């Protein structure tokens, strides 16, 4: 395709002549200007006025309308490029959101599967101890685990800490005290002694977590630390484990006697 144009550029009273063409190869092969037998051949002249405006005079089989077509074609390309970028950005945004959702879901999943003590007690990966804020335990006298009569049956959810402790004390507590976080108050209302002093055979109770946790005190060591056995603490429902709790931490729990 040969497209050669002669341009007259008038600026500040100076006129120059130049060949305007679409590719160097065509310019080298054709220096004859407009060829009426070539449907793609054309020539034009233009001047630039004092304000920098272009004024064209066209000759040949090509018209300025093709400039608009080319412009629209470029716009179409730009639109496609913009659309592609937007699509890429959208993908990036979607991927970012998916990644965030994945992180969020992953975090929630980890929280769901994180070891818990009974029905929702707090679990510490550093010491495997329940950590609670020290609170004054409600207290009441009149009934104790040693002289209480056994309840008719274990009504707590099988596999949970409450179920295990009920059986561990021989059923000598209420069978309708609810979740572990309610046991201290329920025990006090029922006449049991509740305080912050651990003792062998007592029930350790904490309200930490969504449902709290209870454990059975197997013994108190000479240094004040305590040994407890419990169910569903860090190893899933129905699993009984034991651990030692330091004296400082042991003093922060409630104990039902």
From Swiss-Prot:
<dbReference type="GO" id="GO:0005576">
    <property type="term" value="C:extracellular region"/>
</dbReference>
<feature type="repeat" description="2">
    <location>
        <begin position="76"/>
        <end position="78"/>
    </location>
</feature>
<feature type="repeat" description="3">
    <location>
        <begin position="84"/>
        <end position="86"/>
    </location>
</feature>
<keyword id="KW-0843">Virulence</keyword>
<feature type="repeat" description="8">
    <location>
        <begin position="99"/>
        <end position="101"/>
    </location>
</feature>
<keyword id="KW-0732">Signal</keyword>
<comment type="function">
    <text>Not known; immunogenic protein.</text>
</comment>
<feature type="signal peptide">
    <location>
        <begin position="1"/>
        <end position="26"/>
    </location>
</feature>
<feature type="repeat" description="5">
    <location>
        <begin position="90"/>
        <end position="92"/>
    </location>
</feature>
<keyword id="KW-0677">Repeat</keyword>
<feature type="region of interest" description="Disordered">
    <location>
        <begin position="101"/>
        <end position="144"/>
    </location>
</feature>
<feature type="repeat" description="7">
    <location>
        <begin position="96"/>
        <end position="98"/>
    </location>
</feature>
<feature type="compositionally biased region" description="Polar residues">
    <location>
        <begin position="107"/>
        <end position="116"/>
    </location>
</feature>
<protein>
    <recommendedName>
        <fullName>Staphylococcal secretory antigen SsaA</fullName>
    </recommendedName>
</protein>
<dbReference type="InterPro" id="IPR007921">
    <property type="entry name" value="CHAP_dom"/>
</dbReference>
<feature type="repeat" description="4">
    <location>
        <begin position="87"/>
        <end position="89"/>
    </location>
</feature>
<feature type="compositionally biased region" description="Low complexity">
    <location>
        <begin position="122"/>
        <end position="136"/>
    </location>
</feature>
<feature type="repeat" description="1">
    <location>
        <begin position="73"/>
        <end position="75"/>
    </location>
</feature>
<keyword id="KW-0964">Secreted</keyword>
<feature type="domain" description="Peptidase C51">
    <location>
        <begin position="136"/>
        <end position="257"/>
    </location>
</feature>
<dbReference type="Pfam" id="PF05257">
    <property type="entry name" value="CHAP"/>
</dbReference>
<feature type="repeat" description="6">
    <location>
        <begin position="93"/>
        <end position="95"/>
    </location>
</feature>
<feature type="region of interest" description="8 X 3 AA tandem repeats of Y-[NS]-N">
    <location>
        <begin position="73"/>
        <end position="101"/>
    </location>
</feature>
<dbReference type="InterPro" id="IPR038765">
    <property type="entry name" value="Papain-like_cys_pep_sf"/>
</dbReference>
